[in-house]
Swiss-Prot record:
The modification N-acetylalanine is found at A2. One of its GO terms (biological process) is pollen tube growth. The lineage of its organism: Eukaryota, Viridiplantae, Streptophyta, Embryophyta, Tracheophyta. The active site is at S173, D274, H304. The gene is CXE18. Carboxylesterase acting on esters with varying acyl chain length. It comes from Arabidopsis thaliana (Mouse-ear cress). It comes from the Eukaryota. It catalyses: a carboxylic ester + H2O = an alcohol + a carboxylate + H(+). Keywords: Acetylation, Hydrolase, Serine esterase. This is Probable carboxylesterase 18. Expressed in roots, flowers and siliques. A motif (Involved in the stabilization of the negatively charged intermediate by the formation of the oxyanion hole) lies at residues 94-96. Gene3D superfamilies: alpha/beta hydrolase.
Amino acid sequence: MATDSQPNQKLTLPLKTRIALTVISTMTDNAQRPDGTINRRFLRLFDFRAPPNPKPVNIVSTSDFVVDQSRDLWFRLYTPHVSGDKIPVVVFFHGGGFAFLSPNAYPYDNVCRRFARKLPAYVISVNYRLAPEHRYPAQYDDGFDALKYIEENHGSILPANADLSRCFFAGDSAGGNIAHNVAIRICREPRSSFTAVKLIGLISIQPFFGGEERTEAEKQLVGAPLVSPDRTDWCWKAMGLNRDHEAVNVGGPNAVDISGLDYPETMVVVAGFDPLKDWQRSYYEWLKLCGKKATLIEYPNMFHAFYIFPELPEAGQLIMRIKDFVDERVASLSA
């Protein structure tokens, strides 16, 4: 376990960040209808999108690829214009409670650009279907099918120096949950199903897990930014799941046994003011109990989704932590 700073008793944030958090929370709360649906028309008023850009900006260009137009399954490829061969590939799943946002939402477009530039890596950000219009297991199906499409078409998608044998999954919040569950599916597949894609690491940034029993963090961190029991309960209901479902409470009473799977080494990121932190720590402990390699990185003075705010020093620190993890996993292949 590693901690990047000493804990404070109170969350202290820059004014810019506080304003952004207030706007995001107000927007999502007002979009959620009492009947469990979402006012998408209202959201579109605030959901600014970044178009793909084939011209490099800060050495990174972007392009979009359609997997299945009928279900709006596509991904954005972030290409770092750097020298060298065998550049890793990071498959990224965005957060948003399974119900909000997309790869071309400005916050996630910016995050993936930073990943591509700083690691460096080819980043593939998957657009999956959203709840409540599309319930479980649509999001996991889309993640798996996107990987299968990359496996079968990588020659026409990725440049020659992109090395799919150095493939990582990454995701934050709901995206961390999707990354975990899609990784299990891939590990269960026959080896002949994925010959190009070799999953060697998973970067789980404040993954969205839960359970029927409330944790101490859920009880104590009332009023924390973005996340509350009411909001998370709404998201699980939108997915059509109870909170002890195997996809929600991954180490709980209905947990999937991964002890016999070649599950990738995992980096789990936790923040001190995130009401989900106990579930994330439990995930880390469960991975270890299953005999899997895992590392826990803690930011005691941060909140849920802190890393999408580039003005925070911890956001930059996390990018470098992720780079270290990627470099160490790649180096282990030749050790």
